[in-house]
Structures are given as C-alpha cells and as structure tokens.
Amino acid sequence: MATIVKKQETIQDKDQVKAYLTQKGLVYESYKTPESLDLILGQKGLSDAEKEEVLSGLEYRFDQLKKQHGYKANDLVVLHDEVPGISDMLAKFDKLHIHTDEEVRYIIDGSGIFGFIIDGERFEVHVGKGDFISIPANTNHWFTLDQTMRIKAVRYFKDNSGWTPVYVDESKVLINA
C-alpha cells in the first residue's frame, strides 16, 4: 500500500492516497500479486528465465492493461544492493527529471520512493508490493530505492523511445518548499 509523504502530512489511507494522486494527475491502483509467484519473488535476484516465468504469471494483468491503456510491451526490472553498478543506475533517476512518454510501474516485490514536484508542491510516494502507478509524460519526478534496497517492478510501455530522462532544474518548478 502506497504512502504519501508531504511537507507536514502523511497520507496512508488507501482511498485518500488514490484521491490525492488522482488530483495530481497520477494513476494509482493496488493489485494483489498471485500467490503462485511468492516463492520466486522472494528471491533477491532473478535469472532471465525466472523473469520470463514471472511475466508469464502476470500475463493476465498485461492483457487487461493493453486493452485499457494501449500498452504494447512490458519487462521486469529487478534492483537490489548486489546488482553491479546499482549506484550509477540509481544516480540516473534520483534527480528531478521528466520523460516524454508516461512511466508505468507495477511493484511486485520490495519497495521504493517516487518523488514529485507537481503544481509547485514537493511530495513523495512510497510504493511497495501491489502498487501500480502511472506517471504522465512530462511530469517532474525522481525515483530511488528505500532502505531495503530491493524492488521488482513490471514496466509497461506504449513506446520505448521516451525513456531517456530529461533533467529539470528544481529551482524553476518548486514553489511551496
């Protein structure tokens, strides 16, 4: 279940989280992951074959999202403290940036933090297992792992070409520090 952390407020109620994110133009849902995947998802890392097994086990979700949102492809990203180059990888996304295509994540294990500056307001969304978030194109955000240093997320794409981060000067978008 996602948690919103703002300057002087924390929102944990599922309905309030969804309402707040909807108001900010983000899509948030909470989906249960199939219990049949629990054993494999409990592993720290996954081989390519295991990633394919997980994606196959979630094919029903992809089919739903293709119909609802027009996604054409998906993949599974597995990040943890033993991934070679993890610090450099995270450094690409822990600074304020946008993408020219929407960013869509379904968290199936672990946890992380998406940060946003929308309408001049800074807030964080702490995501965990079962959280689905869609960030519209050109939305100021950043991402980092939390203290667990572990996340598995299915990424959904309409077009892979919009995935280069375009960095944003925070001082030009932050009004309500």
Swiss-Prot record:
It is an enzyme of class 1 (oxidoreductase). Pfam families: ARD. It catalyses: 1,2-dihydroxy-5-(methylsulfanyl)pent-1-en-3-one + O2 = 3-(methylsulfanyl)propanoate + CO + formate + 2 H(+); 1,2-dihydroxy-5-(methylsulfanyl)pent-1-en-3-one + O2 = 4-methylsulfanyl-2-oxobutanoate + formate + 2 H(+). Pathway: Amino-acid biosynthesis; L-methionine biosynthesis via salvage pathway; L-methionine from S-methyl-5-thio-alpha-D-ribose 1-phosphate: step 5/6. Binds 1 Fe(2+) cation per monomer. Binds 1 nickel ion per monomer. GO terms for molecular function: acireductone dioxygenase (Ni2+-requiring) activity; acireductone dioxygenase [iron(II)-requiring] activity; iron ion binding; nickel cation binding. InterPro entries: ARD, ARD_bac, RmlC-like_jellyroll, RmlC_Cupin_sf. GO terms for biological process: L-methionine salvage from methylthioadenosine; L-methionine salvage from S-adenosylmethionine. The record marks 105 as: Important to generate the dianion. Its cofactor is Fe(2+); Ni(2+). The keyword Iron applies. Ni(2+) binds at residues 97, 99, 103, 141. Fe(2+) binds at residues 97, 99, 103, 141. Its EC number is 1.13.11.54, 1.13.11.53. The keyword Oxidoreductase applies. Keywords: Amino-acid biosynthesis, Dioxygenase, Iron, Metal-binding, Methionine biosynthesis, Nickel, Oxidoreductase. Belongs to the acireductone dioxygenase (ARD) family. Monomer. Catalyzes 2 different reactions between oxygen and the acireductone 1,2-dihydroxy-3-keto-5-methylthiopentene (DHK-MTPene) depending upon the metal bound in the active site. Fe-containing acireductone dioxygenase (Fe-ARD) produces formate and 2-keto-4-methylthiobutyrate (KMTB), the alpha-ketoacid precursor of methionine in the methionine recycle pathway. Ni-containing acireductone dioxygenase (Ni-ARD) produces methylthiopropionate, carbon monoxide and formate, and does not lie on the methionine recycle pathway. This is Acireductone dioxygenase. It comes from Leptospira biflexa serovar Patoc (strain Patoc 1 / ATCC 23582 / Paris).
